[in-house]
Amino acid sequence: MQREEIVAADRADNDGGELVYNDSGADIDADTSGGIDRFWLSGGLRITMEQQIDFLRRLRNNQLPFSRRSVEIVKDIMIAKDTMGYTVRAKTGWGAMSGLDIGWYVGYLESDSRVYYFANCIQSAKPDNPHFAPARIDILYSILGEVLGKKDSN
């Protein structure tokens, strides 16, 4: 298993680039040629870690073209961990491409007045690896623990 990259931002402001949406909320140049189960990994709608972070900023700041109520419901569904010190909102993703399992764990951690956005993407060439699914999350919590100076963030 290989950790590709972690993108984390220590800021609560929205300074990302512009994404363009049509009425449905999808990119105007939407291209589902990658297939319904892999368009986000390959094809015209593949998404980078930076785009994941930008989308998460817009979600957190209610800057998406959806009703505030709908966005708040999504944020509530995304709560992965809620403790007295912080809240993690996150989403997993998993797909296969070119013989590799590709796993995502994206979201953000809110702690007092600080916000940490993250996008973790890992790959494995071993099919049916029982450690793959939890590794997406475990790697991220290990890094967040270091960033927050805590031994056990999981």
Where on the chain are the PLM-derived regions?
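Mid-domain, small-residue-enriched loop/turn segments at the edges of structured enzyme/sensor domains
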Residues: 1-61
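Structured C-terminal helix/loop/strand segments within mature extracytoplasmic catalytic/sensor domains
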Residues: 44, 53-154
